[in-house]
Amino acid sequence: ESSFAEKTFAVFPTLVFGGNLGKKSKYPVSYLTSGLKEIGKWLWLARFLKLDSKFHFIHANDIAQICGFLIKNHKEEQYKGFRKFVLGQKFISIDDAIITLLKRHNMRRFFAIPLTKKILKILLRILPIQTTPWDSFSIKKYDFNHVPITNPETFKLKSYAKSLNDILRLSKLPSCNNN
């Protein structure tokens, strides 16, 4: 065992949000946060689909908070040795995310067609849609629910962005700042 083992930890962030879209910032905007600008173009269509696939997300501030805590407290007994942490908030379904976004954009859902894994695979075969290897992996995996999941509350800290509503508010996307 290496002398570095007790000081070593690995973090595996789930989907990372961070930065804001409303003004210039000294911090970069994450790929996912920058993608929030595109949601309005597709939300009208997404509201008619129901996807139960689950995922976790985490804000960059929460990642920094957890890493800072682990660096300062690596000598404590419960954190000794090489540790692995999957970082994220409690999972939400894609459908829950769509509903949250619809509320933020003052849109309604009248009905939704369940888009199962099987239907999704068929659509990808018959429609002229190109998928990347990551897209294909994600469709096969379908659910990205990790156990255990680590967030600031794991260490008795307070999350900067615990919910998707927090993410939308902090992103400073103009249509998403109506609490």
Question: Which residues are covered by each model-predicted region?
Answer:
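Short, functionally important structural connectors and interaction interfaces within domains
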Residues: 8, 47-50, 84
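Acceptor/aglycone-binding surface of glycosyltransferases and processive sugar-polymer synthases
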Residues: 24-29
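Mid/C-terminal beta-alpha module of Rossmann-like enzyme folds, strongest
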Residues: 62-133, 151-179
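Low-complexity, charge- and small-residue-enriched intrinsically disordered regions
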Residues: 43-60, 125-148
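Short aromatic/basic micro-patch
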Residues: 10, 54-57, 91
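A conserved pocket-lining segment of Rossmann-fold NAD(P)-dependent short-chain dehydrogenase/reductase
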Residues: 31-58, 66-69, 78
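Short, well-ordered coil/turn elements that cap or connect secondary structure elements
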Residues: 3-5, 52, 107
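Conserved beta-loop-beta element that borders a ligand/cofactor-binding pocket
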Residues: 1-23
